[in-house]
């Protein structure tokens, strides 16, 4: 058995994801696949368009063997923490052999070079980084500029190599890949990394063309504007389309950030700058800007646009407001990191091969496998606190269901993992 690990959101599972799955299995020669997938809230500070069990079901029906949930506290975090949470989870399972992620560059070597520098920064690199941060831009841009300057100074790279590294630092999936590699190094993990080029659609593309591949962003944008599934039929597997149609039909999808608009504005207007200061990723006096803008804006979009700046991107603002909604504080994140990251592996969906993987994990995993919360007792305070955030996230997410009968709390206790029986 050779187990391939994937880090995913599947929002929703589309043809590009299926291509990534098939190519990853081919280049790694893996026999089994496990995907760590975000739950009901995602890394860009948005809710998933359909709940986590249905997205896991889409993936298993399209060939992923096992889906494990990335705890909410990491799923909604910065690229660095998102990657750390996901890689730590795969590492702690004990028998994952390799990792394959999509990237714009399609070559793991330059990403490994960058990860090496960022993982063990010299005093000179830190000095150059401070210089660029003080110029006032966003941290990712400052870090990219500092890295290029530092590498030029070392004179260890030719012009072509520097150009390749420069290009790598401009693309979101490359940056996320670098964070995966940093986490593997930090954990001294035996998991072997691979990458493949993303096929066709750009990560941020908002258009669905005649191609069979479209970005998840384009699919969500289409559903938000057109409010029908017909236009996405060519870019998602049939199972994804059927599951989406069912969820839409019973009032459980699609879910968008605007569904939480009134809740968020209410929370902000009853908060104080002192309260906001405790929310994770709020720093440098940003709480005052958020507080002021919340009393001027009447929609979420107005709020995002009012708060964002050259230093604080819209995506970062979206994440911060999601942390507020879910009450994820700085103390929470520091506490979880101090206790080694994810404390359990929650099973969302699996097939017969997934069952074989779970059997393997029984003897290798350093964290408990959780299939039914009714039968799970957190083994320590970190697990208890982490699980409380996961449950809170689902309880709030279900408030966006248009069928009020389905919006009750404790869905985490009432929903079992999906099992795909190959004999059916």
From Swiss-Prot:
Catalyzed chemical reaction(s): cytidine(34) in elongator tRNA(Met) + acetate + ATP = N(4)-acetylcytidine(34) in elongator tRNA(Met) + AMP + diphosphate
Main location: cytoplasm
GO cellular component: cytoplasm
Keywords: ATP-binding, Cytoplasm, Ligase, Nucleotide-binding, RNA-binding, tRNA processing, tRNA-binding
EC class (word): ligase
Transmembrane segments: none
Localization in the cell: Cytoplasm
Superkingdom of source: Bacteria
Enzyme Commission code(s) on record: 6.3.4.-
GO molecular function: ATP binding; ligase activity, forming carbon-nitrogen bonds; tRNA binding
Disulfide-linked positions: none
Family annotation (InterPro entries): Rossmann-like_a/b/a_fold, tRNA(Met)_cyd_acetate_ligase
Keyword Metal-binding: no
GO biological process, one term: tRNA modification
Pfam families: HIGH_NTase1
Binding site for ATP: 7-20, 102, 173, 198
Entry function: Catalyzes the formation of N(4)-acetylcytidine (ac(4)C) at the wobble position of elongator tRNA(Met), using acetate and ATP as substrates. First activates an acetate ion to form acetyladenylate (Ac-AMP) and then transfers the acetyl group to tRNA to form ac(4)C34.
Entries under PANTHER family matching the protein: TRNA(MET) CYTIDINE ACETATE LIGASE
Sequence similarity: Belongs to the TmcAL family.
Protein name in the entry: tRNA(Met) cytidine acetate ligase
Organism: Alkaliphilus oremlandii (strain OhILAs) (Clostridium oremlandii (strain OhILAs))
Taxonomy of the source species: Bacteria, Bacillati, Bacillota, Clostridia, Peptostreptococcales
Gene name tied to this protein: tmcAL
């Amino acid at each position: 058995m050779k187990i391939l690990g994937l880090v995913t959101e599947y929002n929703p599972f589309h043809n590009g994801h299926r291509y990534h799955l098939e190519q990853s299995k081919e280049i790694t020669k893996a026999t089994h696949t496990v995907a760590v997938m975000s739950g009901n809230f995602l890394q860009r500070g948005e809710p998933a368009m359909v709940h986590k069990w249905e997205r896991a079901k889409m993936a298993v029906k399209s060939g992923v063997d096992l889906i494990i949930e990335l705890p909410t506290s990491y799923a909604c975090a910065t690229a660095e923490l998102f990657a750390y949470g996901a890689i730590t989870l795969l590492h702690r399972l004990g028998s994952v052999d390799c990792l394959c992620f999509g990237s714009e560059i399609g070559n793991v070597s330059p990403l490994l070079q960058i990860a090496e520098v960022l993982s063990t920064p010299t005093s000179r690199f830190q000095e150059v980084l401070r210089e660029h941060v003080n110029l006032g831009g966003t941290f990712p841009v400052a870090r990219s500029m500092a890295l290029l300057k530092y590498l030029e100074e070392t004179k260890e790279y030719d012009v072509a190599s520097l150009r390749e590294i420069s290009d790598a630092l401009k693309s979101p999936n490359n940056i996320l890949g670098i964070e995966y590699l940093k986490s593997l190094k930090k954990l001294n993990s035996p998991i072997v990394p691979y990458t493949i080029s993303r096929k066709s659609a750009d990560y941020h593309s908002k258009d669905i063309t005649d191609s069979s591949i479209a970005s998840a962003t384009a699919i969500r944008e289409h559903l938000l504007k057109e409010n029908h599934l017909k236009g996405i039929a060519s870019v998602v597997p049939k199972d994804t389309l059927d599951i989406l149609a069912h969820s839409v039909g019973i009032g459980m999808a699609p879910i968008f950030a605007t569904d939480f608009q009134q809740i968020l504005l209410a929370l902000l207007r009853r908060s104080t700058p002192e309260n906001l200061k405790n929310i994770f990723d709020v720093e440098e006096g940003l709480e005052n800007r958020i507080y002021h803008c919340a009393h001027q804006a009447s929609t979420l979009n107005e709020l995002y646009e009012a708060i964002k700046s050259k230093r604080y991107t819209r995506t970062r603002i979206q994440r911060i407001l999601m942390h507020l909604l879910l009450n994820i504080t700085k103390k929470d994140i520091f506490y979880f990191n101090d206790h080694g990251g994810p404390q359990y592996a929650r099973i969302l969906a699996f097939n017969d091969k997934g069952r074989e993987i779970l059997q393997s994990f029984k003897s290798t995993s350093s964290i408990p496998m959780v299939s039914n919360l009714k039968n799970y007792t957190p083994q320590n305070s970190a697990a208890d606190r982490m699980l409380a955030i996961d449950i809170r996230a689902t309880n709030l997410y279900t408030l966006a269901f248009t069928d009020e009968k389905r919006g009750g709390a404790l869905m985490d206790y009432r929903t079992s993992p999906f099992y795909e029986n190959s004999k059916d």
